[in-house]
Design a protein with these regions (language model features):
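Amphipathic alpha-helical segments of tetratricopeptide repeats
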Residues: 88-89, 153, 272-273
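Active-site neighborhood of glycoside hydrolase catalytic domains
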Residues: 138-182
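Long, well-ordered mid-to-C-terminal structural blocks that present hydrophobic/aromatic surfaces
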Residues: 248-254
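Non-catalytic C-terminal accessory modules of carbohydrate-active enzymes
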Residues: 257-352
Length: 352
């Protein structure tokens, strides 16, 4: 079992910490305990995927025997579908029957939450009402967009071509919804509002660029860097001094993916100096000022994924994987050894 940790959260799993953040990283390592932990997390959720159209719980506690869902639907099905699909794509495995049914359940659940404008409805996001999120928020919609992308590739590998094409159509619908509903010009940048009626910049506007939506990527990343970057991390919103490291880690990976490698490298070095080598060594933290900046291991998996998802920009096709490296000027060569991709350990060198 992999649990968030932090001196408090043990024998429990969360849809964001375990399924969305950690499971995709575990797939690359080929560590036996981590593979067990990834599949344990998936398995524990199986009984909660129901025929009553109820959201899955945000967290399963006490070794999966009970649950917590105090914030309602946080977009947890989207988190599960995204992270679990990526796990199987990275491993080069097809899901067994239980996992296959779980992925299909999540896809159906998300589809039923797509509003007429193309956004995906949820009660809140992973911040659980600490900040406003409206009836539909950018995080849930962007993760859903990414989830249908990777799930569609997995379906293609499974020979489910019609269902894969349906995923592509749902992706397009959500992308249109994100543009129409959340697209906005804020602080002089063509970027996104986090939910309808909100005109302040939020850190999670980095998610569409991370998930591959390019239309407002530069504006969103510009706004974040100018207004929210501070001391090696991101403020969650421009009007409050609240920090959640997870968004900073997605942001750095998004900078790499957007081709802004020098900027990404500078941000990564600053984060490493502050978090890994500085006063909060040796891990990134959950939040400030909440809970004394405790360490959570799921966020640390996101730090590792800056390299795989950002600098190397690993992608997936029906046949295998792709690499689209983004090397900053400071690096002339990158060597990767014993990374697990699509059925085996691989080593490769990236030269400019």
């Amino acid at each position: 079992v992999h649990s968030p940790g932090g001196g408090q959260y043990y024998a429990a799993v969360w849809c964001n910490d375990e399924c969305e953040y950690a499971t995709p990283w575990f797939a690359f390592t080929d560590d036996a305990a981590e593979q067990d932990a990834a599949k344990t997390a998936m398995h524990w959720w199986a009984p909660y995927m129901n025929d009553r159209d109820l959201p899955i719980p945000s967290s399963l506690i006490s070794e999966g025997t009970d649950y917590w869902n105090g914030a309602g639907d946080r977009g947890d099905a989207s988190m599960f579908l995204y992270g679990s699909s990526r796990y199987f794509l990275t491993r080069g495995e097809l899901p067994a029957e239980e996992a296959k049914a779980q992925l299909a359940w999540c896809a159906d659940y998300i589809e039923r939450r797509i509003a007429s404008d193309g956004t995906v409805l949820s009660d809140t996001d992973e911040l659980e009402n600490r900040l406003s999120s409206g009836d539909a928020n950018l995080s849930t919609s962007a993760i859903s967009y990414g989830a249908f992308g990777v799930y569609g590739v997995l379906l293609s590998r499974m020979g489910e071509k019609v269902e894969a094409e349906k995923c592509a159509a749902l992706q397009r619908k959500i992308a249109d919804g994100i543009e129409k509903t959340f697209g906005a010009r804020l602080t002089g940048e063509d970027c996104y509002r986090y939910h309808a009626g909100l005109d302040e910049v939020r850190a999670w506007i980095c998610l569409p660029p991370y998930m591959g939506i390019k239309s407002r990527a530069d504006g969103a990343l510009n706004a974040i860097g100018r207004l929210l970057w501070e001391n090696g991390s991101l403020k969650t919103t421009e009007n409050e001094n609240v920090v959640w490291d997870r968004s900073a880690l997605y942001y750095i990976a998004a900078l790499f993916r957007a081709g802004r490698a020098d900027e990404a490298w500078a941000r990564l070095k600053e984060t490493a100096a502050t978090r890994l080598l500085g006063e909060r060594a040796p891990y990134v933290v959950e939040a400030y000022p909440e809970n004394g900046m405790r360490h959570l291991s799921g966020e640390s998996a996101l730090f590792c994924r800056i390299i795989t998802d950002g600098l190397l920009d690993v992608g997936f096709t029906e046949e295998g994987f792709t690499l689209s490296p983004h090397l900053p000027a400071a690096l002339s060569r990158v060597e990767v050894k014993d990374i697990f991709l699509c059925g085996g350990r691989r080593s490769f060198t990236v030269d400019k």
